[in-house]
Amino acid sequence: MKNMTLKNITAACHGTFHGDSSFLEKEITGVAIDSRKAAPGFLFVPLKGARVDGHTFIPQVMEQGALATLTEEDPSSLTCPCIHVESCEKALRDIAAFYRMQLDIKVVGITGSVGKTSTKETIASVLSQKYNVLKTEGNFNNGIGLPLTIFNLTEEHEVAVLEMGIDHFGEMHELASISQPDICVTVSYTHLTLPTIA
């Protein structure tokens, strides 16, 4: 991924850094929400789910070599570099939006009710004949998956083809603010989806 320091990240997510200040100039090598994927140099984002709280895995990921972690909890309980935020999920989106804007890359955003994935695959296939393309993989098309896809972008990529799925009011605006698409493709919308677009 393109260079991004903990200082950049702290500012992007409006957080407060806790730990050795010399770490602020260090660059992360990736971002993970899954403790099993938190490799050396990564920033860990501990999300809270219905049954699992990612904060419980912070000691594990730091042992694996992660550079720092976000946290919603009392940072004084941690001995590792951390960025305290109100919401790790929102911080994930804010950091992704910041990262996307650091890249000189064209983004094609695709949304709709039916046909998003096939349209994404077709567009990515055509563009890849000329450009280095990154596309959304699997179902990584929501407020968590989209940021993770964006973090996979490098300076070698020329185009990103990003699928954006929406299921609640305001989500389209939220996803667009993260991806900042240069080109928008809207495929078929059903009457059930229309109320969620705004």
Model features per residue range: what roles?
Residues 1-94:
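N-terminal leader/targeting and accessory segments in enzymes
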Residues 91-192:
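Phosphate-binding loop of NTP-binding sites
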Residues 193-198:
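A short, hydrophobic C-terminal helix/tail in secreted or cell-surface proteins
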